[in-house]
């Protein structure tokens, strides 16, 4: 590129948040509902199921932290996917908590993974110490079997996060 520097978006949430702040959307009636559909790019070693360029459609609702708003976004996604005629869809929801309860869960998960280090894939034998959640996202058979028995984040939520998660579940039911 002749020494020029270019920036490729890795995902859509950060640019939406930047636009929200830059354009004074905090002064609008809340919540503010925004969406995007753009190409995004990853800078990592290619692996099965993960390409460097991909299209991402996203919805962001800013200004209302309620579980009902989370349910609204999930229902929007479900309706969209269903309208495409997709069959056999399954919805799984989870929570990794907040800055209060997540560190304890991350420590617990890290300890669990250390005990099963020899059973996880080679890539994650190196990575789990810095980001144990990545092991739970790995599609390799060895990591899938370890992940299936890993401690559940939902079982380690603080009271506020548990209340939010249960509120989301009851809204979706």
Predicted regions and their residues:
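TRNA-recognition modules of translation machinery and tRNA-sensing kinases, especially anticodon-binding
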Residues: 1-173
